């Protein structure tokens, strides 16, 4: 699961707690038993939504989708590994994929360390990747 992968990289000491919370959510139940550092991920207001989306597999959904799909990911994405984008692409009937060098989760091209990457999430002065914009326009014009 993507969130478990994220936690294993960013806060490995919380991985077992995360797995236990997901086990509870998969059973359709809500829990208030989680460490404070996981509050932003698992607060009580978010859990019903999480229970709902966990019932869906994006690979199965995109496999049934007949309309063209453009899958965009960056090789510097801290949240979604490019292998996830490739799994979607391989599952889709009619798709294109774009993996952008140095691009992160907020579609900004960042060179540097993880801290610089994370800081970019809150920097409105950074521009969306030109390559992403060009590819999106090209993709839409073909529809």
What spans do the regions from the language model cover?
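Soluble or luminal CAZymes and related metallo-dependent hydrolases
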Residues: 13, 54, 80, 127-132
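Accessory cap/linker subdomain of secreted extracellular hydrolases
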Residues: 1-52, 56-59
């Amino acid at each position: 699961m993507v969130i478990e992968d994220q936690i294993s990289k960013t806060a490995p000491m919380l991985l077992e707690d995360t797995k236990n919370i997901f086990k509870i959510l998969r059973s359709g139940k809500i829990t208030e038993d989680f460490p404070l550092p996981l509050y932003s991920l698992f607060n009580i207001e978010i859990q019903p939504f999480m229970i709902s989306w966990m019932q869906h597999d994006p690979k199965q959904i995109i496999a049934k989708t007949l309309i063209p799909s453009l899958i965009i990911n960056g090789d510097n994405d801290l949240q979604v590994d490019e292998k996830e984008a490739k799994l979607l692409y391989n599952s889709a009937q009619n798709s294109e994929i774009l993996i952008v060098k140095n691009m992160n989760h907020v579609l900004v091209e960042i060179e540097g360390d993880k801290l610089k990457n994370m800081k970019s999430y809150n920097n409105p002065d950074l521009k969306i990747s030109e390559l992403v914009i060009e590819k999106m326009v090209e993709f839409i014009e073909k529809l």
